[in-house]
Amino acid sequence: MLIIQDHGFVVNPSAWTDEFLEYDYIGAPWAWSENAYIDPFGNHQRVGNGGVSLRSKKLMDVPNKVVIPWDVNQGDFYKHMNAGLFNEDGNICVHNKHLYEEQGCKYAPVEVAAKFSYERDLPENKGLTPFVFHYSLPPSLR
């Protein structure tokens, strides 16, 4: 399922590759931050922006198979999500990522995610014009 919020667009259809379909979740990479996108085990997560993301049926079915916590009072939820908002991408890709992985879900590595979607300038997407963008255009299209 291709999720596209109202501030995201397909900008480079020729950048599509079936490699994207090898993963159950792929979205624009997040910038590395010392104090953000940290899963409950202390690992920094870099892939997960949901504004424009590709999600498999397997991933979407996980909440039908296991209980996925959705509780802001559990641990330091906001630190894990880097936001005071209740965003599903932080839940799926940071806070509860391990539960999805236990069900066999695969997340794209940063290098593949950078070819899929752009949200902000990062070393991994320098010089790339990805398939889609979320929120701001890649430099090659400005």
Labelled PLM ranges:
Residues 1-2:
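Short aromatic/hydrophobic "clamp" motif used to bind/position activated sugar donors
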Residues 5:
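Conserved hydrolase catalytic core segment
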Residues 8-45:
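Conserved donor-nucleotide/metal-binding helix-loop-beta segment in metal-dependent transferases, i.e.
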Residues 45-142:
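Catalytic core and acceptor-binding pocket of nucleotide-sugar-dependent glycosyltransferases
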